[in-house]
Design a protein with these regions (language model features):
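C-terminal and inter-domain tail/linker signature
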Residues: 1-145
Length: 145
């Protein structure tokens, strides 16, 4: 069994590769084939590995200038909880695109929580992710405040 500090390295590297370096291919090797995405970005995508990868790609496509800051991490056993801040602008495909609204160009900054389970090979097997979507939509002018 890995130590809490060792367990924290998996999501830390994942965030760096995927969100900072915009390397979605890294996720393909870091997410188990049988992963369960418990809170998909769009429920119509499903909750499997392809949905997890598609969600990551959608986040990057919608926010080309995305910055993610890890604020806290707690690890125990095979689980790691990550509190983070996502900031950027709606300048890509547009967060309102599913509603027929083009990108607004406005900026947002919201916090989120991810809880992941990690297998013995260092791959994510479960992901629970929640971030403050209403606040983001309000900041982007896509929802009344």
């Amino acid at each position: 069994m890995r130590t809490p500090d060792e367990a924290k390295e998996f999501p830390r590297r994942f965030y760096d590769e995927v969100f900072t370096k915009r390397n979605v291919k890294y996720a393909e090797g870091s997410v188990a084939d049988d992963v369960v995405e418990h809170n998909p970005l769009d429920p119509r995508m499903g909750n499997d590995k392809s949905a997890a990868i598609a969600s990551l790609q959608a986040i990057l496509d919608n926010t080309p200038d995305l910055q993610v800051e890890i604020l806290d991490m707690i690890a125990t056993g095979d689980k790691v909880a990550i509190r983070s801040r996502f900031s950027g602008s709606d300048s890509g495909k547009g967060w309102g695109a599913p509603m027929g609204v083009p990108a607004t160009g406005k900026s947002f900054s919201v916090e989120g929580i991810d809880v992941v389970s990690i297998d013995s090979d260092g791959r994510f097997t479960d992901h629970y992710g929640l971030f403050d979507v209403p606040a983001m939509m309000q900041q982007l002018g896509l929802m009344p405040g």
